[in-house]
Regions:
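C-terminal and inter-domain tail/linker signature
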Residues: 22-24, 30-261
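Sec-dependent N-terminal signal peptides
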Residues: 7-13
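C-terminal motif of bacterial Sec signal peptides marking the signal peptidase cleavage site
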Residues: 16-20
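Positively charged n-region of N-terminal signal peptides that target proteins for export
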Residues: 1-4
Length: 261
């Protein structure tokens, strides 16, 4: 069966990233009874980490923006955490500082995850943030995990949540959310890889129609209508203004089932 690209989640680039203490309780046994064995707290934390999927860990980390839970953030982060958001410092302490700042801010921070998937050591999240009441933003977050299951690196893009839907009535966050077709992950990854090379990088533009099922194409860009025709119209309008959309290099393609980024 021929595979087609059917949907696009398009957002504008910008930025976001914003995370200890621990308490132990001791118990005593009755005189004469054998002392009860206990598990060190560090081992308990390790066991909890191992029981969570990487997606669950990533969701727990972004949740600390709203909860102010610096202890959880520190447990999840590698101490040499690398931050690629140019507005924030790199390292575990910088992340913790951001969480502490949000917790002390007058405005409330909210975090609403919309969709997620994971690919090996990487987790992708699409989330609506409102940092300290400054306004809702839609974000793409990518987290990389190290060999110990800790979050070691982060990239993100943010755009303001549009007040109105696009010309076809779609928003930045509606559409398919469930991850399906896990057996087609690599097939879908290859499809998008070839699409980027042939069409977006301009190597074989005549193949554009091969990647779509006629004019069926759901668009989530705030300014572009559905369909290949809608995309072509938008690109033509940009070209008339002297604006080009240029893809020089594909650095990373993440995929799980029916989602590819």
């Amino acid at each position: 069966m021929k595979k087609f690209i059917s949907s696009a989640l398009a957002l504008t680039l910008i930025a976001s990233v914003l995370a200890g203490c621990s308490s132990n309780t001791a118990s005593t046994s009755d005189p004469g009874s054998a002392p009860e064995s206990s598990t060190p707290s560090s081992q308990v934390e390790s066991n909890i980490q191992e029981e969570q999927t990487n997606t669950e860990k990533a969701l727990a980390l972004i949740g600390t923006f709203a909860s102010g839970d610096t202890e959880t953030a520190r447990e999840l982060l590698d101490e040499n955490y690398i931050q690629h958001n140019l507005a924030y410092g790199t390292g575990e302490d910088a992340f913790i500082g951001s969480v502490e700042y949000l917790a002390s801010a007058d405005g409330k921070t909210t975090v609403e995850n919309i969709r997620s998937f994971e690919d090996g050591d990487y987790v992708f999240l699409q989330t609506v943030y409102n940092f300290a009441g400054a306004g809702e933003q839609v974000a793409f977050d990518i987290f990389r995990f190290d060999e110990d299951g800790e979050i070691a690196e982060h990239w993100d893009n943010l755009a303001a949540l549009a007040a109105e839907p696009n010309p076809s009535g779609h928003t930045q966050i509606d559409g398919t959310m469930e991850v399906t077709d896990l057996d087609k992950t690599e097939e879908n990854r290859e499809l998008v890889k070839n699409f980027l090379y042939d069409v977006m990088q301009g190597n074989n533009p005549d193949k554009t129609a091969d990647y779509f099922d006629g004019d069926t194409y759901i668009q989530h860009n705030t300014a572009i209508a559905d369909g290949v025709s809608g995309l072509n119209a938008a690109l033509t309008a940009l070209a008339e203004q002297g604006i080009q959309m240029i893809y020089d290099e594909t650095h990373l393609i993440l995929a799980q089932g029916n989602f590819v980024l």
